[in-house]
Amino acid sequence: VGSDLPKAQLGLNIGADWKGFDLNLFFNSIIRDAWNNSKFYTDFFPLWTGNHGTQLLDAAKAYEDYLRTGYYASDVPAPTVDNSNSENEGSQYYIEDGSFLRLKTLTVGYTLPRKIQDKLFLKNARIYFQAQNLFTITRYSGADPEGLGYPYALPRQYTFGIQFGF
């Protein structure tokens, strides 16, 4: 059916500093196909119980068209009430382009001028702001292409900090 082993894993770190300010960006990327576990559990898995995913409606419409025309034109499996088609079995339907590019870490900092540090009896005094997982560019329809199989995206995290020495 496919493999979610990465074809490539990439990283890019960009850093710059100017007049006491520093900026650092870290991007990571993976190029691969991915099993969409969210799609697996929401589209057809509960077919014989409870609520149903909206893909079921598309498949039902395609089946009505099939009865009329003899041609089944849908990208979703043909469901049955008794699950005899094994809609929830692994198939190409659940494989997607799981490639992504993510801004993993952004850090902006400012190092205090030497004169101010000397007055405060400090060394290497720096304040900074750091953010993680700010954005992801992907065609993957699940929650997160990096944490496959989990129903939640990676959280954004924000940190303010102070570094100094004596």
Question: What role is predicted for each listed range?
Answer:
Residues 2-7, 93-102, 152-154:
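Short sequence motifs at beta-strands and strand-loop junctions characteristic
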Residues 8-14, 103-108, 156-162:
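Hydrophobic, lipid-facing positions within transmembrane beta-strands of outer-membrane proteins
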Residues 8-10, 19-21, 99, 121-125, ...:
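Outer-envelope beta-barrel architecture signal
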Residues 17, 28-30, 130-134, 165:
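Outer-membrane beta-barrel pore domains and translocons
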Residues 20-24, 115-116:
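Repeated loop/turn-to-beta-strand initiation elements of outer-membrane beta-barrel proteins
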Residues 30-121, 125:
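Extracytoplasmic gating/loop element in the C-terminal half of outer-membrane beta-barrel translocons
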